[in-house]
Regions:
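Intrinsically disordered, low-complexity regions enriched in serine/threonine
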Residues: 72-255
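N-terminal low-complexity, intrinsically disordered segments
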Residues: 1-64, 71
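A generic structural signal for solvent-exposed, polar alpha-helical segments
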Residues: 35-38, 52, 67, 134, ...
Length: 255
């Protein structure tokens, strides 16, 4: 995958280059623009690979998500066609902190995973003037290293297979996470979550393969839920939380 230029980022997510913030904020508000962070991380070798927002209207302060990867991984992927990433969520409407998380991008399904465990914490930096810009960048670089270190855990997930019942139990928990608002449809939805979209995800019933199949189905949607087709999970906050919970449930299966 190629790095996005600034013009390509603007076309996808103009909020990244928003330099103002909501006038409802107090004088204590300290703004860390997403564009500033991107520029600083580019000097460290990182490039934007994806950017999207919950609102497409230029000039708004809405929440947006940016994923970055080191240039070394843009040319040479991990043997299983994945790469570690920095995931940034930000807004300038005062509704949230600057959020930095570790992620994994899987090329085969163009899907972004978010890692969640004790070692790869969810870093939230408040927008207030007491926090330095350097602390944001240092946190992002630390998260990038944590994403690389997560491959040891991924290798363990690949090495351990699940029984059919364990797969069903994981899918059931995933359905409860994704359809927390619709308990009646969770049972049928759980069965659909285990349907793979590609042959390589069905070779072995490993934790890693099971997790990837379920995660992709939860995020991308397309399954019949009641009388409706489930839509992709585009809400950034919900996407992040579902992703993190699915990861936690998957790693909990490790013996």
């Amino acid at each position: 995958m190629f790095a996005l230029t600034n013009s390509e980022i603007v076309a996808r997510c103009p909020q990244v280059f928003q330099t103002n913030y909501s006038k409802a904020r107090t004088k204590k508000y300290g703004q860390y623009t997403t564009a500033q962070v991107i520029d600083a991380l580019r000097t460290e070798g990182y490039e934007v690979t994806n950017a999207f927002s919950q609102a497409r209207t230029p000039g708004q302060f809405s929440k947006h998500c940016v994923r970055l990867s080191h240039r070394d991984f843009l040319d040479t992927l991990h043997p299983d066609e994945t790469r570690p990433e920095i995931v940034i969520v930000n807004s300038h409407d005062g509704s949230s902190s600057f959020r930095i998380m570790a992620g994994i991008f899987r090329l085969v399904c163009s899907n972004g995973l978010i890692i969640a465990d004790e070692q790869t914490a969810d870093n939230r930096i408040c927008h207030w003037k007491g926090n330095s810009f350097d602390s944001v960048i240092n946190t992002a670089l630390l998260v990038a290293e944590q994403a690389k270190e997560s491959y040891e855990l991924i290798d363990q997930m690949k090495a351990q297979n699940l029984t059919p019942q364990q797969q069903k139990d994981y899918a059931t928990k995933a359905a409860q996470i994704r359809l927390a608002y619709n308990k009646k449809s969770q049972v049928n939805f759980a069965e659909n979550l285990l349907v793979p979209h590609r042959h390589e995800d069905n070779i072995t019933p490993s934790i890693w393969n099971t997790y990837n199949v379920v995660q992709e189905n939860c995020i991308k949607g397309g399954q019949l839920v009641g009388s409706r087709v489930l839509r992709p999970l585009t809400n950034i906050s919900q996407n992040v939380e579902v992703n993190r919970k699915l990861w936690n449930e998957a790693t909990a299966l490790l013996a």
